[in-house]
Amino acid sequence: IHERLVGSEMCIRDRRYILQAVNTDVFKEPEKLMSNIEKVTAFLRKNGCGERETLSLVKARDNKPYFTDGDSNCWRMYDFIEDSICLELPESNEDFYQCAVAFGKFQRFLDDFPVGELYETIPDFHNTPKRFADFTAAVSKDALGRAANVREEIEFIKSRRDFYPVLIDNEKAGLLPRRVSHNDTKSNNVMLDSVTRTALCVIDLDTVMPGYSVTDFGDSIRFGASTAAEDEKDLSKVHFSLEKFKTYAAGYLDGLSLIH
């Protein structure tokens, strides 16, 4: 398979498809990743999502949702979603609203999905206490001798240690349900109709696994309600936009609809 085909459209018998290579450096067990995607997309279709409202996998000849070639490269193919666009960044508040609608609908249609059937493809992805423990261990080791240069930032993180177990503690207490979470809820993971600019579907399901809807919402806000790019080095440009927050919250709630 020629490298130029990866992640691009291809036409076979008047139908267009997207061919992608699965990143096995990140996802060591691609069969589990693809099992998650297959189950979630099938459930979305069963619950009423139309042809353009969810990704549709093209099965390999052995009926698996992926193909492994002779060099152990893992490939998958999706139907191409016609008359759609994907924005790297929202170009208007309405675009941001529609992205929120898409992620809200994603939660709504997966509300009763048996989340225990999904694999955790990136272990402890949102286990904040473990992340903090790993952080403090790295600070103590100080392998490159740079900790002294960021002492203020280190203390900032340590001073908030009481907040880090909140989600896990609330799940244990039965107050926070574990749901299907997307875990990469950026605007460039939403397809919009190219004419109406309304939400079609959520894409890039590689990180779909058991989690919390609050982390999906929070990730969208972290990325979308900021006044600067996430890698901006000039912190004077980084602010929280309440207007963008309200826009996203309204769209997300509209997408959620009847979820309580």
Language-model regions, residue ranges each:
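Catalytic activation segment of kinase domains across protein kinase-like and atypical kinase folds
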Residues: 189-219, 223-226
